[in-house]
Amino acid sequence: MKVIVSENAQQLGKKAAELTAQYLREAIAEKGSARIILSTGASQFTTLEALVKEDVDWSKVEMFHLDEYVNLPQDHPASFVRYLKERFVEKTGGLKAVHFVDTSIGTDAIIEKLTGELKEAVVDVGLIGIGENAHVAFNDPPADFENQASYIVVQLDADCRKQQLGEGWFPTIDDVPRQAVSMTVSQILK
């Protein structure tokens, strides 16, 4: 593992974007396409802003979405689908494929759909942060590292919900959803 220390968020985001673009270009050169998993949250702002400016043939990149609240409309300011559309998808000029966690079709249906799509090929790179309470995606501590499913429905704990409130995504704690569909730890580690 290589640790990179940066002076600020802009510098860190730019470096993360450069490395990610390099991995994507290498995968495209080797296999003809690349697959990326994207997460959301304030920690990704500078990285995604810099990544869409990188020299990558986005038409050969398939994007997977890490997690999404259950029953939150996609036009809600806190929707991760909206976040990724506005900050990434719409700025790439067109991706090979986009696999959103669209909970509007039902949790069982989206989990089955995404699981099938994930199994088609290896994911080349993931941009995944760690939350204030040490959650990865919506796998709050103590997460189940043994669950071999690709995606699951999770109950959001109080600390996770407080983080979402604190970041300004929701006006009150009661507005923060209590469930989400999340990629599992075992899938993230693949």
Regions found by a protein language model. Give the residues of each.
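N-terminal glycine-/serine-/threonine-rich phosphate-binding loop
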Residues: 1-36, 108
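Generic structural signal for well-ordered alpha-helical scaffold segments
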Residues: 17-25, 52, 85-89, 115-119, ...
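Glycine-rich N-terminal segment of FAD-binding domains in flavoprotein oxidoreductases
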Residues: 25-54
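Short, intrinsically disordered, charge-balanced linker/junction segments flanking boundaries
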Residues: 40, 188-190
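Short, glycine/charged-enriched secondary-structure capping and boundary segments
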Residues: 51-54, 77-80, 113-114, 136, ...
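Ligand-binding beta-strand-loop-alpha-helix segment within the catalytic cores
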Residues: 58-127, 175, 188
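Glycine-rich phosphate-binding loop
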Residues: 121-146
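Class I SAM-dependent methyltransferase SAM-binding "motif I" and its flanking Rossmann-like core
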Residues: 137-185
